[in-house]
């Protein structure tokens, strides 16, 4: 009986194969994996924000990216961005219902510490982006942004339970109709757990703390936000996967505003949905 149980347990464990960790945390928090040398993929990656202090607010940004892994230590992505807006009755924002091509983004990821001798793996990600419309309001602007991330993870239970954490620095500069360049920056840190509940399906939770500043060098603090929510990853086939997250601002504050939460620099809720198609 004991040998039968041990054999059954071994079969169960064998069903849980090794996973690439890049997208298992829902993609707000990103894992360290860079894929297999020579891999190519197409990735529609949508980020959406919902809810301001009052009125109706929804805005999304979809990056249509080509991903290529020239070596096991380096990965590149690039492609156009499409944005959509549905804004009505939000103080400080003009009403808008529209969709438009909104720029171009690229990303370079490089492994700093490979998993092996070290229990942790760490990857550096740099993502420059150009936008022709403001990501919050949709008005025409000239915007340049650089998202810099340290992406780290470790395996707590082999092939089953994973811990990920990110550090974020995101400076940007924007020129609107007045012709004046305005600088701002967002910094943050995250922690995420992901559990492979059945083979190729991972559920988890993601926690982010974000701070916003006027000026690129932490000039004037304007507000902060804590986001928390569930994540889902599904390896649909050997060539296709899905990664999703939905997070709510559970704490935060805006400088000079009494109500809780920062709903000027951040949204009440945010979501992310990515599909990957290898070829």
Region roles according to the model:
Residues 10-279:
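Transmembrane beta-barrel domains of Gram-negative outer membranes and organellar outer membranes
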Residues 3-7:
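N-terminal signal peptide c-region/cleavage motif recognized by signal peptidases
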């Amino acid at each position: 009986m004991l040998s039968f149980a041990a054999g059954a347990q071994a079969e169960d464990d064998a069903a849980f194969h090794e996973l690439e960790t890049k997208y298992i945390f829902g993609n707000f928090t990103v894992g360290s994996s860079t894929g297999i040398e020579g891999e190519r993929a197409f990735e529609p990656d949508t980020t959406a924000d919902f809810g301001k202090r009052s009125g109706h607010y929804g805005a999304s940004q979809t990056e249509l990216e080509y991903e290529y892994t020239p070596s096991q230590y380096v990965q590149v992505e690039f492609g156009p961005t499409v944005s959509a807006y549905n804004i009505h009755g939000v103080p400080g924002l003009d009403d808008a219902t529209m969709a438009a091509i909104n720029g171009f983004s690229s990303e370079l990821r490089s492994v700093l510490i490979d998993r092996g001798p070290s229990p942790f793996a760490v990857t550096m990600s740099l993502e420059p982006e150009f936008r022709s419309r403001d990501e919050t309001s949709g008005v025409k602007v000239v915007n340049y942004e650089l998202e810099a991330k340290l992406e780290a993870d470790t395996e707590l239970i082999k092939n089953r339970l994973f811990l990920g954490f990110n550090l974020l620095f995101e400076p940007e500069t924007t020129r609107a109709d007045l012709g004046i360049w305005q600088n701002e920056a967002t910094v943050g840190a995250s922690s995420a757990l992901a559990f492979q509940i059945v083979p190729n399906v991972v559920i988890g939770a993601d926690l982010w703390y974000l701070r916003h500043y006027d000026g690129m060098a932490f000039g004037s603090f304007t507000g902060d936000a804590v986001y928390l929510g569930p994540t889902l990853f599904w390896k649909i086939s050997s060539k296709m996967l899905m990664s999703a997250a939905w997070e709510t601002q559970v704490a935060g504050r805006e400088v000079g505003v009494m109500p809780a939460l920062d709903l000027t620099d951040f949204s009440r809720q945010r979501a992310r949905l990515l599909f990957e198609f290898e070829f």
